[in-house]
């Protein structure tokens, strides 16, 4: 969970109105550098895909499991949440992650509003088979993810602080596509099912016309 302070312009007042925007996000907890720095330093950065595709997304983090439809185009992706994300401002049915803009957009259709959040590593998904900071890879053998045959690997990565993390990684051997990544050291995994490699339209990754854009800044979760 993240608390986000939202600044809304109130035409009846000279002072901005403050809201607490509570959203359940993809908290990956990778401890990587700021996004711009990480992208510049890494050969296999999270959040950037070498090809365009759509897939059914399943992820689990901090005991929470969620499902969505995912659309990916290079340095941007669209997540259509099953059931939506409950926030203090209503339900966000869609999240758009834009690495080029360094922004994440929550789309609240009922309010015709887009909440814009600064991009952090919390929002990045892995798309490449070779992982950022990978130091070793061991083939375990044949496996299955959903209805797809897969090769299962054990992969060890090291972050910039020298801390290591072990993953199990399932790869589609025919298309060399990442199907599932599961941490052995924490309660986290991400899975891509029914992956269709195809061109994705640009408008999937833009904010809807006529929607109000408001900005949010991260704040500490209140104690108690």
Spans of model-derived segments:
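Short, exposed beta-strand/loop patches in secreted or surface proteins that constitute
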Residues: 45, 68-72, 95-97, 137-142, ...
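N-terminal leader/targeting segments and the immediate start of mature chains
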Residues: 3, 22-77, 207-224
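Gly/Pro-enriched, hydrophobic low-complexity segments
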Residues: 83-86, 93-95, 146-211
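Edge/loop elements at the starts and ends of beta-strands within beta-rich repeat scaffolds
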Residues: 46-50, 132, 148
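An acidic-aromatic
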Residues: 68-127, 183-194
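Bacterial N-terminal signal peptides that target proteins for export
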Residues: 3-21
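N- and C-terminal low-complexity/disordered segments
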Residues: 71-74, 98-99, 108-111, 174, ...
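A short, amphipathic edge element
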Residues: 63-64, 128-140, 190
């Amino acid at each position: 969970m993240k608390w986000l302070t939202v600044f809304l312009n109130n035409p009846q007042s000279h002072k901005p109105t403050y809201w607490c925007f509570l959203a359940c996000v993809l908290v990956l907890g990778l401890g990587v550098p700021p996004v711009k720095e990480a992208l510049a330093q890494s050969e296999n950065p999270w959040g950037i895909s070498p090809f365009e595709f759509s897939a059914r997304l399943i992820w689990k983090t901090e005991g929470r499991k969620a499902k969505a439809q995912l659309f990916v185009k290079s340095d941007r992706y669209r997540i259509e949440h099953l059931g939506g994300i409950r926030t203090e401002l209503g339900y966000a049915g869609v999240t758009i992650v834009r690495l080029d803009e360094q922004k994440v957009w929550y789309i609240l259709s009922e309010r015709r509003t887009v909440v814009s959040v600064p991009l952090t590593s919390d929002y990045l998904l892995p798309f490449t088979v070779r992982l950022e900071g990978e130091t070793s890879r061991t083939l375990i053998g044949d496996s299955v993810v959903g209805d797809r045959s897969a090769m299962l690997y054990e992969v060890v990565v090291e972050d910039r602080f020298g801390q290591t993390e072990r993953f199990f990684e399932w790869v589609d051997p025919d298309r060399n596509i990442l199907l599932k990544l599961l941490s052995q050291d924490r309660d986290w995994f991400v899975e891509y099912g029914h992956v269709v490699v195809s061109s994705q339209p640009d408008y999937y990754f833009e904010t809807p016309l006529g929607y109000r854009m408001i900005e949010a800044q991260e704040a500490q979760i209140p104690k108690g």
